[in-house]
Amino acid sequence: MLAEIAAQKEVYFVSGICEKDGKDFYNSSILVQPDGFIHTYRKTHLFNEEKKWFSPGNTGFEVFTISGKFGEAKIGMMICFDWIFPESARTLALKGAQIICHPSNLVLSYCQNAMFTRAVENRVFTITANRTGKEHNGGSELYFTGESVIVDPKGNYLARAGKDDECIIITEIDPVRANDKDVTPLNNIFHDRRPDMYMD
């Protein structure tokens, strides 16, 4: 269905899915193109009881180029709990991502604020689409924290939903802004890195 809508409207979609591959199940995210081609990312960092049901992702963090009337943009994907590992967003940024799409079922209350840091430390746009409401399973209950959020490369919140809002947020962004990695005239977040000092 998403592929049909993408073709009709000439748009791209990023969506979370449960993916079956042989006997393995993955918590995955797909980037659906208007031409029907689908890119897949499999969640690297499984959260809590996900480890009982899903296999750890094996795709790695890849960046995909999309194009249309807006020009071109480079998209990376990470899923939910991937956010807590700064290497996730940094890997995507180092590979050229301008926009990091982050479909989520967040239950921890502080991720949406942490996405400010992921955006600023990598000078990218981050788009977190989170679930709202409660889910009951047997005797347990999960509360999803909502507050879907879009942050720009300088840490400005371009949009933020409420905790219980089920909504569509439309925001215009210029992906080229994410190409500027200068913090000051003498500091560039990538050129100033010291990988030789980061080893275990």
Task: Pin down the residues of each PLM region.
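Glycine-rich, aromatic-flanked loop segments that form ligand/cofactor-binding clefts
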Residues: 18-20, 133
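A conserved C-terminal secondary-structure "cap"
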Residues: 178-200
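CN hydrolase (nitrilase-like) catalytic-core segments centered on the catalytic cysteine
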Residues: 1-12, 83-168
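Short beta-strand scaffold segments in enzyme catalytic cores
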Residues: 15-17, 28-31, 62, 128, ...
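Active-site donor-binding loop signature of nucleotide-sugar glycosyltransferases
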Residues: 43, 66, 153, 163, ...
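Hydrophobic residues at beta-strand termini and immediately following loops
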Residues: 41, 64, 129, 161, ...
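Active-site catalytic loop in hydrolytic enzyme cores
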Residues: 4, 20-95, 104, 110-117, ...
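Short helix-loop capping/hinge motifs at secondary-structure junctions, enriched
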Residues: 36-39, 156-158, 178-180
